């Protein structure tokens, strides 16, 4: 059984070591299954991308990842994937918390595009529907500790709530 405490999360950038990056991540870029699960679009990488990669400690086999694209004023969550055998074990929760913690440390707003059904899963983590196009939504998460709506609250993870965010149709 794979448990979160048996795993490590690494931060990778292809520009640091392109050969090593694609030797490990290439199978995900080439996989039709990963493409289908990531909305039908191929994975992309670029100079502003950072990959949070989850694997068992001492093992090189990647169990999952979240990619983000950091710009001076916003972070875009791009792609997320977890192998089927690693699902339902709290691993994605651990990965998501690490990524959002990183975004909070940067003090930047965060945006992502996702299928409409996923909006309710991201609502408890500070994301709100910004716009809708077909079955996809753009979600925004304000920068923590820097926005006037936070009343000067300190930077940190968004507290989990039991309320589900409502989806707007703009």
Model-derived regions, located:
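Short amphipathic alpha-helix that is part of the acyltransferase structural core
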Residues: 1-38
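Conserved beta-strand in the GNAT
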Residues: 53, 60-69, 74-81
